[in-house]
Amino acid sequence: MPHHYILTLFGLLPVATNISTWWNFGSMLLTCLALQVLTGFFLAVHYTANINLAFSSIIHITRDVPYGWMMQNLHAIGASMFFICIYIHIARGLYYGSYLNKETWMSGITLLITLMATAFFGYVLPWGQMSFWAATVITNLLTAVPYLGTSLTTWLWGGFAINDPTLTRFFALHFILPFAIISLSSLHVILLHEEGSSNPLGTNPDIDKIPFHPYHSYKDFLLLTLMVLSLFIIVSFFPDIFNDPDNFSKANPLVTPQHIKPEWYFLFAYGILRSIPNQLGGALALVMSIMILFTIPFTHTANLRPMTFRPLYQLMFWTLVSTFITITWAATKPVEPPFITISQVTSTLYFTFFISIPFLGWMENKMMHLN
């Protein structure tokens, strides 16, 4: 075994010749993770987890710390880039049937949940107006849990309201969870390379494989360069594009913002939550909007793996994509007609996609046998 065996392992990794650009997002996610850990460390050095000083410490980072503004913007916009990549990565897995590699899919969805928790805790840390109220609304959902709800909420807050202990523990969780993400990512990659990645045709590629390096590594590097370039263009010219104007004001528990909403990457789940007028029902729908992804490997009934040759399933998939975008857009709007109706219709369509998977598979199998 050579002394640089890990590099050799990745270099000689056998990969299907026909994987497309959609398979590049794994390496892009790894880059995002490295960037987030690095910038997060430099921010944590200057951040103060105290409700009286947190907002001021962010101002201090952006104004007084050398290149602090860049670190802060890279970390905030890097999170958005992370979610763009992970949503495309999941969509590719859905489209090309990668979920049939069950262990890899399960570890990937666990990764998504951990990432969402990390991002939520991070959004609270600047202690701006929207940070505070988003944290209040989302953590309040725990009160919907029968019998234990109030105790759970008090335990999470560290008191009877969101206060100093809440911010301290959220900072601790935001610091520790990325290490869980790194561990899960390693497990995800190990499980993936145990069976090998899928390909656009959904066939067994064992007879036609090439080394990962140099063929696919250069292909990955192209999209990676475009992503980093986009990131730096946004950081330099449009740093506040994903920010909420309310978050430029310090948290004030006495003043409620006109429209409370989380970061854009949670809006689809928040839109589903808001579309149900019952608190427990909304909380369950919110949890199920992510958890339902775990069921997909078990509901696949089609003879073909990818959607490449499945027109019915393709139609449903692109309906899901447009539904996802519409829920996200509707969740940015106030809770009033017609946005309530739009949210309810799109939420129903979102869950319909996952429920219809086995029936579509059976229907397509039947049509193929008829032909």
Curated annotation (Swiss-Prot):
Transmembrane segments: 25-45, 69-90, 105-125, 170-190, 218-238, 280-300, 312-332, 339-358
Biological processes annotated in GO: mitochondrial electron transport, ubiquinol to cytochrome c
Location (main, coarse): mitochondrion
PROSITE patterns associated with the record: CYTB_CTER, CYTB_NTER
MF terms in GO: metal ion binding; ubiquinol-cytochrome-c reductase activity
Intracellular or extracellular location(s): Mitochondrion inner membrane
Chain positions recorded as a ubiquinone binding sites: 193
Binding site residues for heme b b566: 89, 188
Co-factor binding details: Binds 2 heme b groups non-covalently.
Sites where the protein binds heme b b562: 75, 174
Listed InterPro entries: Cyt_b/b6_C, Cyt_b/b6_C_sf, Cyt_b/b6_N, Cytb/b6-like_sf, Cytochrome_b, Cytochrome_b_C_euk/bac, Cytochrome_b_N_euk/bac, Di-haem_cyt_TM
Cellular component, GO annotation: mitochondrial inner membrane; respiratory chain complex III
Membrane-protein topology: Multi-pass membrane protein
Keywords: Electron transport, Heme, Iron, Membrane, Metal-binding, Mitochondrion, Mitochondrion inner membrane, Respiratory chain, Transmembrane, Transmembrane helix, Transport, Ubiquinone
Classification via Pfam families: Cytochrom_B_C (PF00032), Cytochrome_B (PF00033)
Cofactor (UniProt): heme b
Gene3D superfamilies in the cross-refs: Cytochrome Bc1 Complex, Chain C
Subunit structure and binding partners: The cytochrome bc1 complex contains 3 respiratory subunits (MT-CYB, CYC1 and UQCRFS1), 2 core proteins (UQCRC1 and UQCRC2) and probably 6 low-molecular weight proteins.
Additional free-text comment from the UniProt record: Heme 1 (or BL or b562) is low-potential and absorbs at about 562 nm, and heme 2 (or BH or b566) is high-potential and absorbs at about 566 nm.
Family the entry assigns: Belongs to the cytochrome b family.
Function: Component of the ubiquinol-cytochrome c reductase complex (complex III or cytochrome b-c1 complex) that is part of the mitochondrial respiratory chain. The b-c1 complex mediates electron transfer from ubiquinol to cytochrome c. Contributes to the generation of a proton gradient across the mitochondrial membrane that is then used for ATP synthesis.
Protein's name according to its UniProt entry: Cytochrome b
Gene coding for it: MT-CYB
